[in-house]
Amino acid sequence: MFLAQEIIRKKRNGLALSSEEIQFFVQGITTNSVSEGQIAALGMAVYFNDMNMDERIALTTAMRDSGTVLNWQSLGLNGPVIDKHSTGGVGDVISLMLGPMAAACGGYVPMISGRGLGHTGGTLDKFDAIQGYQTEPSSELFRKVVKEVGVAIIGQTGDLVPADKRFYSIRDNTATVESISLITASILSKKLACNLDALAMDVKVGSGAFMPTYEASEELARSIAAVANGAGTKTTALLTDMNQVLASCAGNAVEVKEAIDFLTGAYRNPRLYEVTMGLCAEMLLLGGLASNEADARAKLNRVLDNGRAAELFGKMVSGLGGPVDFVENYSKYLPQSQIIRPVFADMQGYAYSMDTRELGLAVVTLGGGRRKPGDALDYSVGLTQVCALGDKVDSSTPIAVIHAQSEAAFAEAELAVKKAIHIGETAPEKTPEIYAYIRASDL
């Protein structure tokens, strides 16, 4: 029998906690036998004194086991259960293509996603733009779609990782969100509760990223890769660029449209293609569905070119309550803004740098994102045709097209977009889409 205050004291004094102490405390978070004040105190003690890798693994697995852990064995799946998670960014629509692409190559992708908050968009919000799509289906329907289609993208259910829900809300109110140890446990407990065989982790770097510096992003990526592999899930973390909007757009309905265009081959943004392929190829390799990266990329290009990935996206949408002809007729179902108008830079030149976070906040200002949890969204608004760094812009080439519901909202977003995209006389040096892969062998 342990005492919560003694566990807090031990961590406050900079000592390592045993896995039994961590399990006891997490159980107390779940059963409410540990108070909010005690949870806040432990969070602050961890923030200042950190946790070693054994402690991080113990915290992650204890939080994973605080609720239901999904079991796929009874479904008799004939392929690996694989997934991807992103730390979030602007125009990060990867999940919508990656899930069906991986499923078309023989994987099963039970993706549990979140809603957007602050400047980052949420995968679930994009699906909420699709009429009828159930982001919170019954567990029976979720399992049925995973088995029959190979991919289902839904929201977190109440019985998954309840400890994280309580711990996170207290961290949010007590300034301990930024702890790498606690971020690692929060992200991975939710993913590992899905009982995955393999995970590709997308850790963003740059002006639109969650972590403020490259060094902090790399530290988080290493922590996630080490803890996930230590907990028994094959995981690779990729460090990817978020110094500009990833897709050509940012919003909800506009990103769904770009995902369909990507899957059908109507338009594939080259940067988006590179990061999607990098993550998806890693999932196939970790899941044993490809022998090397070239093999993985060839398989992925095949399911894009032959239409199989687009077909599975359509089946997932209809399987979860959306229209059966969504891929073919998406424009009939997606909401559209009242005002769709380009914005031009005040000078001609090249898109030199971008404050990606500010562009994400411009979408929030339009009504396409949340200032606080629970805010209602307008799924039609956002930005399209966002220029890429290095693009030449002038009086006839816009830096973006704004989708707004009123002249006032358009004017506010126009100012924000012009301020966020910096124009230079020369093009900037090209930066890679993927900075690094952190595999188990690198740890």
Swiss-Prot record:
Relate the assembly described in the record. Answer: Homodimer.
**Name recorded for this polypeptide:** Thymidine phosphorylase
Could you confirm whether the keyword Ion transport appears in this record? no
Identify the GO cellular component terms for this protein: cytosol
Q: Which SUPFAM superfamilies match?
A: Nucleoside phosphorylase/phosphoribosyltransferase catalytic domain (SSF52418), Nucleoside phosphorylase/phosphoribosyltransferase N-terminal domain (SSF47648), Pyrimidine nucleoside phosphorylase C-terminal domain (SSF54680)
Report the enzyme's class at the first EC level: transferase
Point out the gene that encodes the protein.
Answer: deoA
InterPro entries membership: Glycosyl_Trfase_fam3, Glycosyl_Trfase_fam3_N_dom, Glycosyl_Trfase_fam3_N_dom_sf, Nuc_phospho_transferase, PYNP-like_C_sf, PYNP_C, Pyrmidine_PPas_bac/euk, Pyrmidine_PPase_CS
Reaction catalysed by this enzyme: thymidine + phosphate = 2-deoxy-alpha-D-ribose 1-phosphate + thymine
Under NCBIfam families, the record lists: PRK05820.1, T_phosphoryl, Y_phosphoryl
Q: Member of which family? A: Belongs to the thymidine/pyrimidine-nucleoside phosphorylase family.
Q: Name one Pfam family in it.
A: Glycos_transf_3
Q: Which UniProt keywords apply?
A: Glycosyltransferase, Transferase
Entry EC no(s):
2.4.2.4
Task: Classify the source by domain of life.
Answer: Bacteria
Q: Name one GO molecular function term.
A: thymidine phosphorylase activity
